[in-house]
From Swiss-Prot:
It holds the Pfam family Globin. InterPro entries: Globin, Globin-like_sf, Globin/Proto, Hemoglobin_a-typ, Hemoglobin_oxygen_transport, Hemoglobin_pi. Heterotetramer of two alpha chains and two beta chains. Belongs to the globin family. Keywords: Heme, Iron, Metal-binding, Oxygen transport, Transport. Red blood cells. Coiled coil: none annotated. The lineage of its organism: Eukaryota, Metazoa, Chordata, Craniata, Vertebrata. GO terms for cellular component: blood microparticle; haptoglobin-hemoglobin complex; hemoglobin complex. This is Hemoglobin larval subunit alpha. CDD domains: Hb-alpha-like. Involved in oxygen transport from the lung to the various peripheral tissues. PANTHER family: HEMOGLOBIN FAMILY MEMBER, HEMOGLOBIN SUBUNIT ZETA. The keyword Iron applies.
Amino acid sequence: MVLSAEEKALVVGLCGKISGHCDALGGEALDRLFASFGQTRTYFSHFDLSPGSADVKRHGGKVLSAIGEAAKHIDSMDQALSKLSDLHAYNLRVDPGNFQLLSHCIQAVLAAHFPADFTPQCQAAWDKFLAAVSAVLTSKYR
């Protein structure tokens, strides 16, 4: 999936605002995921899944940090996310459909926290970007 220069700028620009708040925002996205799509909890049976828990915030921070890395290497995401792709495909065996569910939750959190920045154009860019990240993470499932 090719993002235009404008779309890349929108993604990278918002990533700059997210970077200092990865745990809180990522945790909120996971809280939304677990509340809305209960089947996703099965991958985290070893976590305290109560809303706002340290486990959820810590993992949410890892998720948003990885997304930040993908944004930094937006033209070479395959290489930047290769180890993460291996982990999800070979070890964790996460259902690929869950990435799309999480993408929606991430966008809801971004819209709630950055309403002035998360314009329709920005949302479209983020939707496209997160679909590309999901495609990379599921590319080794075959």
